Design a protein with these regions (language model features):
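Conserved acidic, metal-coordinating active-site core of Asp-based
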Residues: 91, 95-208, 212-220, 229
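Short, flexible loop segments at the rims of nucleotide/cofactor-binding pockets, characterized by
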Residues: 14-17, 37-39, 77-78, 126, ...
Length: 260
């Protein structure tokens, strides 16, 4: 069986960034039993915590399906064309949004358009803690942007911003923020690339997730598992709701389905 795992809120506790030992042990045990574990995350590949990188995953679906890697081979690695960036940056500023541009190797922020939402400071500290850079767009874009997120503050007009960029991106609404993936990408599209490459039917798949950007993945697989700490929409899309991350939810669900 091929089993897909989100990272934040699924493999790792999103706030504390703790990776439960039970989850790490479960991934190793799946491999020993002949199953194929694959990461399926919204994070770009270079933003993945080294503790997760050290686990024996067979594949990596990153940036919501824009980057897909099987073993040492890239099946897909799609970044935002540099010529789009001036219009995106100008539209963010005009519509008073807060923004994080998630690039290869780190974050680009945008001065006053990235310093008013507390989540940006939290995410910037986390990305620095794993060796990634945090720079300002005014210093120049030395690395390609993979995807970006906007955060609402009083006076933001996200709707007007989406009208500008909808020709290029599909937004994912995440309660006061939005994640922007290049059109045609999703966690479900990414996992299908992996399945096509290894010749596995959807019926022989399972996925673990917790949030809104996991919905395409949860709806696509044969067996969908939502973490106990997940959002209500993800729970409704799942076949089984397990315990929370910190209650060893990964291990609990895999044992429930007889995979460990």
């Amino acid at each position: 069986m091929v089993i897909f795992f989100d990272i934040d809120g699924t493999l790792m506790d999103e706030k504390s960034q703790i990776l439960p030992q039970s989850a790490a042990d479960a991934i190793a045990a799946l491999v020993e039993k002949g199953h194929i574990p694959v990461v399926n995350t919204g994070r770009p590949y270079t933003h993945i915590d080294p503790r997760v990188r050290a686990l024996p995953f067979a594949g990596w679906i990153c940036a919501g399906g824009q980057q897909v890697r099987l073993g040492e081979r890239w099946l897909k690695n799609e970044t935002v064309p540099m010529e789009w960036m001036p219009e995106i940056i100008e539209a963010v500023r005009r519509n008073n949004l807060q923004v994080v541009y998630e690039a290869e190797g780190g974050f680009y922020l945008d001065g006053a358009y990235s310093d008013k939402h507390p989540e940006i400071a939290i995410q910037s500290a986390l990305i620095r803690s794993i060796g990634c850079y945090v720079r300002d767009v005014e210093e120049g874009l030395d690395h390609p942007v993979v995807k970006f997120c906007t955060f609402d503050i009083p006076g933001s007009n996200r709707g007007a911003f989406i009208e500008v960029v909808k020709q290029w991106f599909d937004p994912i609404d995440r309660r006061g923020m939005a994640e922007f993936l290049i059109k045609g990408n999703s966690k479900a599209a990414g996992l299908q690339l992996v399945l096509d490459a290894i010749g596995c039917p959807l019926a022989d798949t399972m996925a673990f997730g917790d949030s809104g950007n996991d919905l395409p993945m949860l709806k696509a697989v044969g067996t969908a598992v939502c973490m106990g700490n997940g959002v209500e929409e993800a729970k409704q899309a799942a076949h089984f709701v397990t315990k929370s991350v910190m209650e060893d939810g990964i291990d609990y669900a895999l044992r429930h389905f007889g995979l460990l």
